[in-house]
Amino acid sequence: MVEWTAAERRHVEAVWSKIDIDVCGPLALQRCLIVYPWTQRYFGEFGDLSTDAAIVGNPKVAAHGVVALTGLRTALDHMDEIKSTYAALSVLHSEKLHVDPDNFRLLCECLTIVVAGKMGKKLSPEMQAAWQKYLCAVVSALGRQYH
């Protein structure tokens, strides 16, 4: 279980309050698929991902970015039970979808870049530290089934 200070909880909540899931979700997934092209292999049914423009203009990528970020947002309401919150999703990604668990980390890195771009100087080092702790807890929970 991850231990959270009151300040860390406030910082994570503050970051989430600045995130528009419908904007940041697609941007984070688009960035992940472009920067780390090997992650595209899990999205073959999404159609054309052959160019950056195709990825950015792909409505299935955008929709899945919203789904992924909505799922990531779930942890905010369950910060004291992140592992159990993501247990079923971990099983799905490991046993059915066979997703490399490192891809969760890559997506979260891309999300952090998107969030930093949106928040600018308002994303203080303390906020970023709490945000990274939150993302690491979720990534660990999603990868738990792989261990």
From Swiss-Prot:
GO molecular function annotation: haptoglobin binding; heme binding; metal ion binding; organic acid binding; oxygen binding; oxygen carrier activity; peroxidase activity
- Which InterPro entries does this one have? Globin (IPR000971), Globin-like_sf (IPR009050), Globin/Proto (IPR012292), Hemoglobin_b (IPR002337), Hemoglobin_oxygen_transport (IPR050056)
What this chain does, per the entry, is described as: Involved in oxygen transport from gills to the various peripheral tissues.
Gene that this polypeptide is encoded by: hbb1
Per the record, the similarity remark reads: Belongs to the globin family.
Keyword Glycosyltransferase on this protein?
no
Q: Which UniProt keywords apply?
A: Heme, Iron, Metal-binding, Oxygen transport, Transport
Name which cysteines form disulfide bonds.
Answer: none
Mention any one GO cellular component term assigned to this protein in its UniProt record: hemoglobin complex
Domain of life, source organism: Eukaryota
Q: Which biological process annotations from GO are given for this protein? A: hydrogen peroxide catabolic process
Q: Where does heme b bind?
A: 64, 93
Every Globin domain range: 3-147
Report what the protein is called.
Hemoglobin subunit beta-1
Quaternary context: Hb 1 is a heterotetramer of two alpha-1 and two beta-1 chains.
Q: Please tell me in which tissues this protein is expressed.
A: Red blood cells.
A Pfam family name for this chain?
Globin
What the entry lists under Gene3D superfamilies is as follows:
Globins
* Organism, scientific name: Gadus morhua (Atlantic cod)
